Swiss-Prot record:
Belongs to the LptF/LptG family. It is found in: Cell inner membrane. GO terms for biological process: Gram-negative-bacterium-type cell outer membrane assembly; lipopolysaccharide transport; transmembrane transport. This is Lipopolysaccharide export system permease protein LptG. The chain crosses the membrane at residues 15-35, 64-84, 104-124, 279-299, 315-335, 337-357. Its main location: membrane. Residues 36-63, 125-278, 336 are periplasmic. It comes from Escherichia coli (strain K12). Pfam families: LptF_LptG. Part of the ABC transporter complex LptBFG involved in the translocation of lipopolysaccharide (LPS) from the inner membrane to the outer membrane. InterPro entries: LptG (IPR030923), LptG/LptF_permease (IPR005495). Keywords: Cell inner membrane, Cell membrane, Membrane, Transmembrane, Transmembrane helix, Transport. It is a multi-pass membrane protein. GO terms for cellular component: ATP-binding cassette (ABC) transporter complex; membrane; plasma membrane; transporter complex.
């Protein structure tokens, strides 16, 4: 049996074309919305409309990764729907091409799309998002902020600050503050395990603070305190311009970060959930295409194209909601994050198989 027969290639070409067209429309719509949102920030530093456009372009890979499952569902629905409307699927079945063989052809098309999704999520999207945020920070603040996969660096007057992670809007973790004098000699190093922003007094409240005084080159003195304060121009809004969300990290980056959090005795549940969600996202692409096929052979066999689109959007939205609900629930009830990440895809896969096989 050939890996890709004539009918496999025909079905694959049709589905691939409609998926790419759908993905282009979804990413374009998202890009327009993002560009308009970035225009609100124009005027800060040298950040202008051109900068907003560049930021939007650099964010495209992340949007591609986000919208790929939805595009797979809608595109497969449209492509298979066109084949059904032209009675081509009926002719295929009449010539001995069974329903499960059609499903296999769809899955063969899904394989390169799954690999493409994995490649974008692991290498292209994280780098693009990091470049976008650094570009925006450079335009707004003149290079005083720099984001990396391991954390972010910031220049605060004569001080340099390294922040391992930004936890939420007003909480930081792993803060190292390197204080220099006007002659650029290192005066002190202060490390805090966590920091929470106090909006009333405009300061950061530090906890578990270790400080080393280097003003005397012959003797280094150290001190440890339970808490402290840090007055700085680095507000949550400014750090949010460049800080990478867990969604923007690669699988390998998340894996290393989870290991670091566990080794330091910190809760890694949120990042584990993000890691498993990224691992299983390519599976959701295949599941969405299988779901589209089950609809075409079932309830959507002879309905207008508009109904298929609405149905696809509805089920894509349901899948998204389930994905957003089950994940946090596993963290709340102490269930392994892998279950919360896998359950929506597994549920839709079983539903698709049932719809395909009930009239086979």
């Amino acid at each position: 049996m050939q890996p890709f027969g004539v009918l496999d290639r025909y079905i694959g070409k049709t589905i691939f074309t409609t998926i790419m067209m759908t993905l282009f429309m979804l990413v374009s719509l998202s890009g327009i919305i993002k560009f308009v949102d970035q225009l609100k920030k124009a005027g800060q530093g040298s950040y202008d409309a051109l900068g907003a456009g560049m930021y939007t372009l650099l964010s495209v890979p992340k949007d591609v990764q986000i919208f790929f499952p939805m595009a797979a569902l809608l595109g497969a629905l449209l492509g298979l729907g066109m084949l059904a409307q032209r009675s081509e699927l009926v002719v295929m079945q009449a010539s001995g091409f069974t329903r499960m063989q059609v499903a296999l052809s769809v899955m063969k098309t899904a394989i390169p799309l799954v690999l493409l999704t994995m490649a974008i999520g692991e290498w292209v999207a994280p780098q693009g998002e990091q470049m976008a945020r650094n570009y925006r920070a450079q335009a707004m603040y003149g290079g005083s902020l720099l984001s990396t996969q391991q954390g972010l660096w910031a220049k605060d007057g004569n001080n340099f600050v390294y922040i391992e992670r930004v936890k939420g809007d007003e909480e930081l973790g792993g803060i190292s503050i390197y204080a220099f004098n006007e002659n650029r000699r290192l005066q002190s190093v202060r490390y805090a395990a966590t920091a929470k922003f106090d909006p009333e007094h405009k300061v950061w409240r530090l906890s578990q603070v270790d400080e080393s005084d280097l003003t005397n080159p012959k003797q280094i003195t150290g001190s440890q305190t339970v808490s402290g304060t840090w007055k700085t121009n680095l507000t949550p809004d400014k750090l949010g311009v460049v800080a990478l969300d867990p969604d923007a990290l690669s699988i390998s980056g998340l894996h290393n970060y989870v290991k670091y959090l566990k080794s330091s005795g910190q809760d890694a549940g949120r990042y584990q959930l993000n890691m498993w969600s990224k691992i299983f996202q390519p599976l959701s692409v295949a599941v969405m295409m299988l779901m589209a096929l089950s609809f075409i052979f079932g309830p959507l066999r002879s309905v207008p194209m508009g109904v298929r689109v609405v149905t696809g959007i509805s089920f894509g939205f349901v899948f998204y909601v389930l994905d957003q609900i089950f994940g946090p629930l596993t963290l709340v009830y102490g269930i392994p994050p892998i279950i919360g990440a896998l359950l929506p895809s597994a549920s839709f896969f079983l539903i698709s198989l049932w719809l395909l096989m009930r009239k086979s």
